[in-house]
Design a protein with these regions (language model features):
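Post-transcriptional modification and biogenesis factors for structured RNAs
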Residues: 1-142
Length: 142
């Protein structure tokens, strides 16, 4: 619940349009999530869907590029072009994205790790990805 709340808060602060989470195998929109979001849950639309892969397909048909985060990504987030309409997929901390979700992503993006630990928690990864998109878009606007 704390990771989801932190992701909602960060997404709202970064200007994201919404968040999509699975109905099954994910935390619900509980009071703990709301508290962890520091009130952002009131402003951030959250869709709970029964089929994430179908939701990704719908986004792609609408012209949204889908970027999945993966330790072994095709490119790093610094080389990913996040300036246009983008959906960022953050996988499960323990298992990452499912095979089907990973296959639906247009790009698999890694966050460079320089230390001994090879992964970030989900909310930290989401924050880095979201604010790289903010950075790229602000540079494109100048």
């Amino acid at each position: 619940p704390h990771n989801l709340g932190a992701i909602i808060r960060t997404a709202e602060c970064a200007g994201a349009h919404g968040i999509i989470i699975p109905k099954r195998r994910s935390v619900g929109l509980t009071a703990v999530v709301g508290k962890a979001s520091a009130g952002a849950l009131e402003y951030m639309p959250v869709a709970r869907v029964s089929n994430i892969t179908a939701a990704i397909d719908t986004l792609k048909k609408a012209g949204v590029w889908v970027y999945g985060t993966a330790a072994e990504g095709d490119t790093t987030l610094y080389r990913a072009d996040l300036k246009s309409a983008a959906a960022i997929v953050i996988g499960n901390e323990g298992e990452g994205m499912s095979r089907l979700v990973s296959e639906r992503c247009d790009f698999k993006v890694s966050i460079p790790m320089k230390g001994s630990i090879s992964s970030l928690n989900a909310s930290a990864a989401a924050a880095i990805m979201l604010y790289e998109a903010v950075r790229q878009r602000s540079l494109a606007d100048t």
